[in-house]
A protein has these predicted regions:
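Canonical leucine-rich repeat
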Residues: 1, 22, 46-51, 70, ...
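Leucine-rich repeat
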Residues: 6-8, 27-31, 43, 54-58, ...
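Concave beta-strand-loop units of leucine-rich repeat
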Residues: 8, 13-18, 34-46, 56-67, ...
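Intrinsically disordered, low-complexity Ser/Thr- and Pro-rich stretches
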Residues: 123, 134, 138, 155-159, ...
Length: 199
């Protein structure tokens, strides 16, 4: 797919294809880019994506694209980022302070720093290898999926807007949800709790 001459493009949806490469360096007007699901079993995958020139991007969907790395440090306008089901060695979202939605699950992440992402409302970081997660700066969070990691503690006392919290399949021994009075869904199964206070 050659879109190098289509410099006026603002929206590009290539989801559910078999792309092995995509050059969007000339498409600086892009605000929406969807590359969901480029993986076909046994086939070559996309592996890399250069969006450093695409500073107008507000929406980037590249889940299950086969990426081994993703640099979004130049994409400061991003409000939506979904990069789950990739084999990323790491994810740096420290420059993406406008993010309200972040999905980076199933990505073999061992750490995730969201301290700069104070506008975050939804965070999906489940099924990684996280041993800690600090969401104390994310006071706008309404949805948190951090299940199936290796968390031994989780502090959600600052997240008073939380309505959905899934933290099962971790190694938690305690969890204080006394400040989370808006919670409607709470998943705690398969942890190491001996007592749970939901008073």
């Amino acid at each position: 797919l050659d879109v190098s001459s289509n410099t006026a493009l603002t929206d590009l949806n290539c989801s559910f294809n078999q792309l092995t490469s995509l050059d969007v360096t000339n498409n600086t007007a892009l605000t929406y880019l969807n590359l969901l699901d480029q993986r076909i079993q046994g086939a070559e995958t996309l592996t890399s994506l250069d969006v450093t020139n695409n500073t107008a991007l507000t929406y980037l969907q590249c889940a299950n694209a086969g990426l081994t790395s993703l640099d979004v440090s130049s994409n400061t306008a991003l409000t939506y980022l979904s990069c789950s089901i990739n084999s990323s060695a790491g994810l740096d979202v420290s420059n993406n302070t406008a993010l309200t939605y972040l999905a980076c699950s199933y990505s073999q992440l061992t750490s995730l720093d969201v301290s700069a992402n104070t506008a975050l409302e939804e965070l999906y970081c489940h099924q990684n290898q996280l041993t800690s997660l600090d969401v104390s700066s994310n006071t706008s969070l309404t949805t948190l999926y951090c299940l199936e990691n290796q968390l031994t503690s989780l502090d959600v006392s600052a997240n008073t807007s939380l309505t959905t919290l899934y933290c099962h399949n971790n190694s938690l021994t305690s969890l204080d949800v006394s400040n989370n009075t808006a919670l409607t869904i709470l998943g705690l199964n398969y942890n190491q709790f001996t007592t749970i206070d939901v008073s």
